[in-house]
Amino acid sequence: MIERAYSQFETSDKNLNSAYKDLLTKYRNYPNFIKKLKIAQRLWIKYRDALIDMEFPSDEPRLDYGSVYPFCVLAFKTKLTKKRTTELLNYMNYEEGNVCAGGPVD
């Protein structure tokens, strides 16, 4: 069970890293966008870890949640990672001419 959960997390993490690298490549000529993307991604990792801590707030999680705790953390982390990957992929196709959609500028 834990091996499968870990494998699913690894796959989602690889997909996230791939989407991130694709953005870095696609927008390499937009240094301000790249700079802010890197900041946002570092903050997202902190946010993800804080959400996990909030989801399982115990100081002794293995005692309070039992042996299933590592599985639960991996499942939650996978869910958050998949969501973030979707968010990053949305930046691959900005709607041209829609200023409110944001996006890299010269």
Language model features: what each stretch is:
Residues 1-106:
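N-terminal alpha-helical modules
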